[in-house]
Amino acid sequence: MLRNYLKVAFKVFLRRKFFTFISLFGIALTLIVLVVAVSLWDHVFGPHPPETRADRVLTVYFINAIGPAGNHTFGPAGYAFLDRYTRPLKTPESVSLHSVFLPTVSYRNGVKIKTWLKNVDAEFWRVFEFNFLEGGPFTKEDEKNASRVAVINETTSRRFFGGASAIGKTIELDRQNFRVVGVVSDVPMLRFTSFSDAWTPISSRRSQMYKREFENGMFFSTLLAKSRADIPKIHEEFRGMLARIEYPDPKLYNKIVARPNTLLDAVSDELFMGGLKTAVLVAIVLFLCLPTINLININVSRIRERASEIGVRKAFGADSGTLVLQFVIENVLLTVIGGLLAFVGCHLVLWLINATGWIPYAHLALNLRIFLYGLILAVFFGLLSGVYPAWKMSQLHPVQALRGGEL
């Protein structure tokens, strides 16, 4: 019996190639976009090296400095503010100050090399868990002495030194020469907080003007909590520090709004008023519903075209349940084929993103669990889009069906 259903289903698919193509395209595209989006999400917010403790790492990414005249400035904080009001916090296990990553140009044997550079303190290597391939991190002593030492990633090591060991060799960064003390695995650019090609001590910057920057700067402060239970205590202690701020120029700015957050919460607060997870959930539901509505319309048109077939089968004794089951099997089979195409498509899209270097050092992988969830949803929506019109048409009188009855 099932074999006959499958034979009929494949005959229908081949006879109505356009409807089959549209249905498969809608199912495959929906799954591909869903899986790729989840892979990107996981790459940004998931616990991956060196940000393996994302659930208890908080960062002051931005501050909002407000003046008495209603003027305000929003962006990364200055080093002076973070050094004075986050470094002394006692609740965190560790506090690290580090700059945003900025591009710098170097030359090697006359070849121009663009490198992302990040200035960090010694605590940075405690907060984040980098995989050292050679050497190790620079120390507090290096930071105190403004030593020109650098940690670089493996790609930068290959660009400057080929396959030879980089340890102890000199590399030009930001028009200064640094001695390489460590080589780490590449960090994807999507790891916004820790990403760079090279990391050097903050104190080794060419200009010391950064020490006077207060509300306007290019620095973050990352706090490692001892446990998740300490996060509310960190927030409370930081609020206490904000209440005691001594403003350099109260006539210009007399209030600062800031909060140490996870990256997910920071993006949620700034872009979605704290509702990022809700916004993403709504977007996913809408994204899945649109192809469903499209499939319903396609199925209604397809079933209407088969009204005469339904009429003939009913005239020869086919009951409503048999007809509905036929359409259900067709829809499930179509969804499974679409899922297989999506599986291949996901691998292809993720491979292209990785191979083209569109996202530096990204290694996006197929999340099978998310793919299976998406496939189950696709099967559910496939059933939803096919059962109702099939059931309505199966209820028609044979004569009415032969006349092309309306649903």
Regions inferred by a protein language model and the residue ranges of each:
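A hydrophobic alpha-helix feature that marks transmembrane segments and, especially
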Residues: 282-310, 389
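Membrane-proximal extracellular/periplasmic loop immediately following the first transmembrane helix
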Residues: 37-105, 215-220
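Short cytosolic juxtamembrane segments of multi-pass membrane proteins
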Residues: 390-407
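Transmembrane alpha-helical interface segments in multi-pass membrane proteins
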Residues: 18-29, 293, 308-354, 369, ...
